[in-house]
Amino acid sequence: MKIKWLCTAFIAVSTLNLYAQTGKITWDKTDYQGKPWVKNVSRPNEISEGLQNRHLSIWASHGRYYDSKKGTWKWQRPILFGTTEDLYTQTIVLPYLIPMLENAGAIVFTPRERDWQKNEVIVDNDSKYNGYKEESLKKKWENTSVPGFAQHYGSYSDGENPFIAGTARQVKSRKRKSKLSSVVYQPTIPESGRYAVYVSYQTQKKSVDDAEYIVFHKGQETHFHVNQRMGGGTWVYLGTFEFDKGNSINNSVVLTNRSTHKGIVTADAVRFGGGMGNIIRGTSVSGLPRFLEGARYYTQWAGAPRNVVSTSNGSNDYNDDINSRSLMTNWLAGGSSYLPHVKDGKMVPIELSLAVHSDAGVKSDGSLVGTLGICTTQQGNSTLGDGLSRQASKTLAQQLVANAKKDIEKSLNISWQTRSVWDRNYSETRLPAVPSAILETLSHQNFPDIKLGQDPNFKFTLARSIYKTILKYEADMHHTRYVVQPLAPNSFKIEYISAKKIRLQWKATSDVSEPTAIPTSYNVYTSIGNSGFDNGVNVRDSYYDIELEPGMVYNFKITACNRGGESFPTETLSAFQRNGAKQTILIINGFHRLSSPAVINNNLEQGFDIEADPGLSYINNAGWSGRQSNFDISMMGKEGVDALGYGGEELVGKVIAGNNFSYTREHAEALSHTGNYNIVSCSSKAVENGEIDLSKYTLVDLVLGNEKDDGHSLIYYKSFKPSLRQKLSAYLQKHGKLLVSGSYLASDMQGADEQLWLKNYLKVTYDGSNANNYNSTISGMGTSFDIYRTINEQHYGAYTPDNISPTDNAFCALTYADGHGAAVAYKGNDYSVFTTSFPLECIKSSSIRNNIMKGIITYLMSK
């Protein structure tokens, strides 16, 4: 009996010791119940079962760093297949993962610069620049008792902290809407484009949790509440917005002293754009945009203390960069409900960190290396945060790996490889004081991996899997319910329902891998003329009616919403109403392609041929280093010049334009100058599904862009799918008038029936590819003009477009610089058609584009 009692006692004590050593496995009652660090109060949809009020630290791996031993700036990983890990993982995290998390309501911090904008403008009270203006009414602005940000000209030395170099301002809050004190931050924007907006302030004892910031952007305004009780003395991200070039109150930020609480509102600098690296190491700065640098340099620019920025005291930037990602996370989270015992923190309730990496390793048999997870449970502090077991990190890593395989295979119908979960001593999983994981997404050294990994649809699917894992993990950690945000709607179309009123209509998209991702409402976003998109209106039905003001081009995009958040948007569609118009032109958007560069993959060679076809990223891409030069498969697994995949660095720092899904806007703008016509638009999918009666339209403008079946993309694209051909044929047979433009509309039609259709209906034949991409001139129609044909940052290019020749009674209307046909026109008693083998939206000059469009429409409409 005594032995049995002793055994029982031993087991009980052991269990207690185990629990004491490892801690609880969920947050239990530990939770943050206050207001979020940042909230967009202009968001039209409510999120109740997503990641609302969850604060996360997410980053892409590595970045450019200074090697003090060699006295040079360098990448942390080698150049392979047109990229390096330092560049590649950003292309998953920034355009896909972070927006998905934010669409679910999360507040995301990242210790590397997140804005692919090379310009930077700072407006601050300490600057002589006159973009800062205070107004004191009932309450007066005064200096805070603690230092603030100040900027000086030129670069910054190691250890220099800009957030203790100046002053900050404060004012007592006011509950009433009238007689508010305010600060206006009005920058001079050097170039029109998208700019991240960061604010800064100082946290005081009586700081309010709902400081009101208003961002004015291209004629729109978006309101934010910032919780100034946390996160003072660093850059706080509000969002990314379209700004016009120049200095205007329509492109500014306003901070007021309005609050629901009695307290203090503080003001410091506001930053527009990511900018260039400005931390000098050795004798120079990196010379690259800040978004390409490692976290070590961003954390310094963001005001982190020296023991966060550089644990080596400036002697080892490589180690500092790895450590600073986690240390800044801890610094921000210190003093919050999740890290209550950490002193001198910023009280931001960050509760999870994730490092997104890619890995090395090859498979000579052509198989995949796949995904690996990493956690640390045996090193570091025995527990995390408020007594949480390190096993919570292992659970996160395991779920990330398992779900990646499940979601990729189910969504893309491919086989995906996963490895395991390593429980090892890595800085990015040892140092964070909250649950953390490293996700090695794939092998950047193994071409079968990176061939899939550079497909934008793969990146979207992987990022969505990571987002869903974090969503479900957080629900488990807090014992709450979750709903997955929907996918973007499809079959978007606009039609007139009366003389001045149009109807926008769309369909929900199902998610085969997630039953909760069902939309319950939709956000309709509108842009009129040259203004930016508004903040949207939330509607319950899958349609929306709106009356148009005449003479203005309206642009629309739709997102799907539910309790879990908001989807990515649809393509942009456009509409235009002309007073007295009796005829309507329909624009069909048939350009949806997203792809990697051209693929070479045989027994002798592997790689991406960027010169032949650079592919199409979602909106844009800063992840390419340069053109691959070594395709020799026998050099697999090596590094340096002799390695398979080695290439140049001529594209480093370039944000290459991709498919922004808004080219109906450019066509509608050009068509609005052509005559007395109304204009509507639709997705090609709506036509293919029989949802559009083409016979209602006087003229159809089919936008194909760079659409084609490239043979390697994970999603099937085609310029003229059989269903679209059938609808266009029927339209033309009824005396229709058709304008078609696209780079590959002829080469994409190689089947005998396809070539016959081109000949019989478009009156064109394929005459090879026009390979002289560096001569962009096109001539004809009484003029000559240039088009985008090469990799650039302004607009996707018509890379190696088709030469086309006329058949029957058609004629060549435009030619490339070498004399080959670039456009074919046909007017018969049966129908009229005008075909260009380059996208009209690629014409560089908008005024020339308008004139060319007017000439084409005049030709097609004339009798």
Predicted region positions:
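Beta-strand-rich modules
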Residues: 545-566
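Pro/Thr/Ser/Gly-rich low-complexity, intrinsically disordered linker/stalk tracts
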Residues: 473-516, 550, 565-583
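Active-site-adjacent mobile loop/cap segments within catalytic or ligand-binding domains
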Residues: 252, 269-277, 352, 358-380, ...
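A short beta-strand element within beta-rich, extracytoplasmic domains
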Residues: 181-205
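Short beta-strand-plus-loop segments that form exposed binding edges in beta-rich domains
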Residues: 253-264
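A glycine-rich, often tryptophan-bearing local segment used as a flexible ligand/cofactor-contacting loop or short
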Residues: 706-818, 847-848, 852
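Aromatic-Pro/Gly-enriched surface loop or interdomain linker
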Residues: 81, 96-104, 112, 282, ...
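Active-site microenvironments of hydrolase-like enzyme catalytic domains
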Residues: 294-390, 422-445
